[in-house]
Regions:
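Nucleotide-sugar donor-binding/catalytic module of glycosyltransferases
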Residues: 1-237, 241-242
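C-terminal subregions of glycosyltransferases and related glycan-biosynthesis enzymes
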Residues: 215-318
Length: 318
């Protein structure tokens, strides 16, 4: 068995329908230099059994939470147990592509950078199962073409990759900067991603697709519940806090790029939901956020397309 150089942290709660595919995608990696920490976050379905059976393999370690604590706390608990030089994350409803770890480990090992970022695609439900979509433009902008030893200032578009997974980083980097995920809220990875970019001495990006991000057929994932007010509050807070991290680091170009992407990609679906939502609080939160970002965009000369601008102009009157 190869000596592990990377720990894969896999948190999950009630993901029995998807966890077997996630774990199989890890076992099928072309690289064998990994170990994994599974975090069962208070599951009440078969996730506990699936994780327990996986842990019979020495490469897997299992952490159990009797009471759900959320993704942030689950990832933090696993981070405390990492003993390998490198660490990465995979959500238990997503999948790795076969060469994911090989490409990420090779890149960061050869470059000496603090972190490396890969591309990802959506897995969407189809007639005969899940169908892999294309690399979206904002994902491609952050990871293509390949770069080694770059920085956020040199490559501000990398700030558009705000997920915990699809990256590999050095555990020493986490511990040197006391990086932790916020606990008790959703979209906890956005602010951590921006902190990583602002703190990294060097960043690698590769255009290779390393993760398939699942859109669950049953609509049960957090990102599929943006019509709920509590989810909206955490979502808006995460986006706002992420931009604030960039501002605090004087990363003006990256902050402007992030504002543009939020206005172009994140806010239009929220505006459409708000236009028919039965809770006036939802519309008020979206309207406040749109006005805040629009003012910021005007000051930074950030442009969005005509259709998006019309939608945002209407929302700014709420």
């Amino acid at each position: 068995m190869s000596t592990p150089v990377v720990t894969v942290i896999i948190p999950g709660r009630d993901v029995a329908a998807y966890a077997p595919d996630a774990l199989e995608s890890l076992r099928n990696q072309t690289s064998t230099q990994w170990r994994a920490i599974l975090v069962d976050d208070g599951s009440i379905d078969d996730t506990s059994r699936i994780f327990q059976e996986a842990a019979a393999d020495r490469r897997f370690e299992l952490i159990r939470h009797d009471v759900p604590q959320g993704l942030g706390a689950s990832r933090n608990a696993a981070l405390d147990r990492v003993e390998t030089p490198l660490v990465t994350f995979l959500d238990a409803d997503d999948e790795y592509t076969p060469h994911a770890l090989e490409r990420l480990v090779t890149t960061i090992s050869e470059s000496g950078s603090d972190l490396a970022v890969g591309a990802y695609v959506r897995l969407r439900p189809g007639v005969d199962g899940y169908v892999e979509g294309p690399v979206q433009p904002w994902v491609a902008a952050s990871t293509s073409p390949a770069r080694r030893g770059t920085t956020l200032r040199e490559h501000p578009a990398v700030s558009g990759n705000i997920v915990a997974w699809s990256k590999i980083s050095r555990i020493e980097f986490w511990r040197r900067h006391d990086l932790r995920f916020p606990e008790g809220r959703m979209y906890e990875d956005q602010v951590v991603a921006q902190r990583m970019y602002t703190l990294a001495r060097a960043i690698d990006v590769i255009p290779d697709v390393v993760v398939r991000w699942r859109e669950r057929a049953d609509g049960s994932s957090i990102t599929q519940h943006k019509d709920a007010v509590d989810v909206l509050v955490d979502y808006v807070t995460a986006m706002r806090d992420g931009v604030a991290v960039l501002d605090a680091a004087s990363q003006r170009t990256a902050a402007a790029e992030r504002v543009r992407l939020i206005l172009q990609m994140d806010t239009p679906p929220l505006v459409r939901i708000a236009s028919t939502h039965d809770d006036p609080a939802y519309r008020r939160i979206v309207g406040d956020f749109v006005r805040e970002l629009a003012a910021r965009a005007d000051g930074d000369a950030v442009a969005v397309d005509t259709d998006t601008k019309g939608l945002l102009d209407a929302a700014s009157l709420w």
